[in-house]
């Protein structure tokens, strides 16, 4: 089996930018698998990335935390010959569709073929009905769905779409320093990561929860060594962070709170949480923790 990976915003870019961002996303996937001591082989097609790995469950857990991935599906691969698709789909469906359940076949194609997407759905649907007892077709609210994606000379069969975090691949935008002090600041840093920012964590030496917050972010990003702020006075903290940022080519400071709004800074200050109320921030925090 393999894992079919889909991306979103990358597809809206020009060809050259899209190619560069896709290459970065593949590199991020390889790094994530390496960190998790899991082997993989990766190929790509226009709009899709294919991750081949022996450990599908672990692969899914790795991929669902990689920015730039909109969704992913564990899938089986076969040729685009309609008879081959039919055999593979029926074998696969026997593991997915239970006795007494309803099902639907959803198909789509890319490339030139002697059959239509509807032909695929009808043929596979009939084959499943003839192979599995006591099942029925329900296109509106099925108990199980069988998806078939035909892309040129290959076809992929799967039954679920697992959501990823979306956004842009980590590292495709500028480097920023994120001041980590509480849950809000973690959410702010996470949002910058989702936009492709290369985030360097900064925290106060006296913050006892810093290690906990950093661990949460590390599961979303292979963070570089964090910077420790010695001072506990806001204006001096800003100066320390600015000095560190320039030395490390960070173009801005990311904050999850507004105390620094009253402080003059020679670097841009980013407040990703502006426009979000406390309930929205709490919901996003729970999502980050849950997925992590």
Region locations from a protein language model:
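Low-complexity, intrinsically disordered short peptide segments enriched in small/polar/basic residues
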Residues: 1, 183, 221, 231, ...
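RNA-binding accessory domains that recognize and position tRNA/RNA substrates
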Residues: 1-225, 246, 289-292
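A short acidic, often aromatic-flanked loop/helix-cap motif at beta-alpha or helix-coil junctions
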Residues: 78-83, 144-146, 232-239, 276-281
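Short, surface-exposed amphipathic charged segments that create phosphate/polyanion-binding patches used
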Residues: 89, 238-244, 279-289
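Conserved adenosine/adenylate-binding substructure
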Residues: 224-271, 290-292
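Short, flexible loop segments at boundaries between secondary-structure elements
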Residues: 265-287
